């Protein structure tokens, strides 16, 4: 049987790191076995859907390199790929289960259900539906329907059954039917509940494997019960439940923690290298056998094995993510870097305004985390209004290196050219004249020309600062040095 996996987000928010991980692992599993990866939109929670939620899922997954074989953007024979287009179908199947006595109409009011829940909590019991409507006679049911009394449809759980599955990540899991409640499968507004719709969709789309977060473990026995009621072959689908992702304090990632950027869009906006995020996310709970860290998408597919997914919490380490991004910026080609800088919203206007911006940016290519940092570094290094720091002046004075600055200034004034090569020649001449080398040569020149004690390649930095700015800085510091 062909491997078919799916990622089925709800458009109630934007693509989260956790969702990106789920999508990536399902994608890798499918591609590792020449299978298909499907994106299905579960949009039945109408009140919570947000504008742009669907586009966020697709756009940022594609930004990470994850493209679906089938979806609303690439529909094939297993559609519709969005649940809101299948509402009548779900309703018909729910009513069919009622006709088969596998499900029943529930006319209980919200007040009655709330009272039952409050009583259970008071008695320290797990709230369960009391089956008030399970055995209503046909006459009562028809009278309620004729009176347009509001109802839901509930599945009748077999309390004597054991709902078990061999989890791909956690091994065998069993939940007794007695621990479950009769779940609502169709709401009063005729919209299918999540657990009902997802079972139907997975079956009809011939999904073979479902990898998802551990919060769905509690949904699985209900989905197995629904599948049994619908006479679906339970052997045709395998479930695997991923570990949680925790922050630096060991707490589960919370979208309410605004101090930690958790949405893929945050990293795209800041100008991270896209595959760095994909690479980082891949290792949130997966350990390749060869312990390789830097991997292309092709290498991820080649190495992926569901048996190497961990059930232990995955640590979201922002420093590790930044490390990945720096590694990629360091390793990509100059042409790739230039194209990225030219086209990214953060930098494309700067490229148009400053013809030397690309050249300046290239000085930092091997060291940056993202383009947001790049902009700050370029501005910091090439800001013509930068202030001279007292500690830098003292460094030159205390090490008796004023003569290095003086000679560099004198040589630069008489130099006919001002380009990278001529600047290097001036520095060589200063070395010969002052007998200084290493830090005693380069540090005072850097401080005097750039008003900074650190930075990229010195000759290039001086060149892109411009002759006028460099001479102005030299004159200023020489006055201070006396």
Curated annotation (Swiss-Prot):
GO molecular function: ATP binding; glutamate-tRNA ligase activity; tRNA binding; zinc ion binding
Gene3D superfamilies given in the database record: 1.10.10.350, HUPs (3.40.50.620)
Annotated EC: 6.1.1.17
Record's subcellular location: Cytoplasm
Short sequence motif named 'KMSKS' region, residue ranges: 252-256
Any one GO biological process: glutamyl-tRNA aminoacylation
Catalytic EC class: ligase
Protein task: Catalyzes the attachment of glutamate to tRNA(Glu) in a two-step reaction: glutamate is first activated by ATP to form Glu-AMP and then transferred to the acceptor end of tRNA(Glu).
Subunit structure as annotated in this protein's UniProt entry: Monomer.
The protein, known as: Glutamate--tRNA ligase
């Amino acid at each position: 049987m062909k491997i078919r996996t799916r990622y089925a987000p709800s458009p109630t928010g934007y693509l989260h790191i956790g969702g990106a991980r789920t999508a990536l692992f399902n994608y890798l599993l499918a591609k590792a076995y020449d299978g298909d990866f499907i994106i299905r939109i579960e949009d039945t929670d109408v009140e919570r859907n947000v504008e742009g939620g669907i586009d966020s899922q697709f756009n940022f997954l594609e930004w990470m390199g994850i493209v679906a074989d089938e979806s609303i953007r690439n529909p094939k024979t297993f559609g519709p790929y969005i649940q809101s287009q299948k509402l009548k179908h779900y309703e018909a199947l729910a009513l069919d289960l009622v006709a088969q006595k596998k499900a029943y109409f529930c006319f209980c009011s919200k007040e009655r259900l709330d009272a039952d829940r409050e009583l259970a909590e008071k008695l320290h019991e797990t709230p369960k539906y009391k089956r008030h409507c399970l055995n209503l006679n046909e006459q009562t049911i028809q009278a309620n329907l004729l009176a347009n009394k509001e109802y839901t449809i509930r599945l009748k759980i077999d309390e004597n059954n054991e709902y078990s599955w061999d989890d791909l990540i956690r091994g065998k899991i069993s939940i007794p039917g007695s621990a479950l409640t009769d779940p609502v499968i169709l709401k009063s507004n005729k919209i299918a509940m999540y657990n009902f719709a997802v079972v139907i969709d997975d079956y009809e789309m011939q999904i073979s494997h479902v990898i998802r977060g551990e919060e769905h473990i509690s949904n699985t026995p209900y989905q197995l019960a629904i599948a049994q009621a619908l006479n679906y072959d339970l052997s045709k689908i395998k479930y695997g439940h991923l570990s949680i992702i925790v922050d630096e304090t060991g707490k589960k990632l919370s979208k309410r923690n605004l101090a930690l950027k958790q949405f893929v869009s945050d990293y795209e906006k800041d100008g991270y290298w896209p595959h760095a995020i994909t690479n980082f996310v891949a290792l949130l709970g997966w350990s390749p056998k060869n312990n390789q860290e830097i991997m292309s998408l092709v290498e991820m597919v080649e190495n992926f094995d569901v048996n190497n997914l961990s059930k232990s919490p995955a640590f979201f380490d922002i420093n590790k993510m930044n490390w990945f991004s720096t590694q990629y910026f360091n390793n990509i080609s100059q042409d790739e870097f230039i194209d990225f800088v030219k086209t990214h919203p953060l930098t494309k206007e700067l490229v148009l305004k400053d013809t030397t911006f690309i050249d300046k940016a290239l000085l930092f290519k091997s060291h940056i985390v993202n383009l947001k940092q790049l902009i700050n570094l370029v501005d910091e290094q090439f800001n013509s209004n930068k202030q001279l720091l007292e500690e830098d002046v003292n460094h030159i004075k205390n090490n008796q290196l004023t003569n290095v600055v003086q000679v560099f200034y004198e040589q630069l004034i008489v130099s006919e050219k001002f380009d990278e090569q001529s600047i290097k020649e001036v520095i060589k001449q200063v070395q010969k004249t002052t007998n200084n080398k290493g830090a005693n040569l380069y540090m005072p020149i850097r401080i005097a020309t750039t008003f900074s004690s650190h930075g990229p390649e010195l000759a290039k930095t001086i060149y892109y600062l411009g002759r006028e700015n460099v001479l102005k800085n030299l004159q200023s510091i020489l006055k201070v040095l006396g």
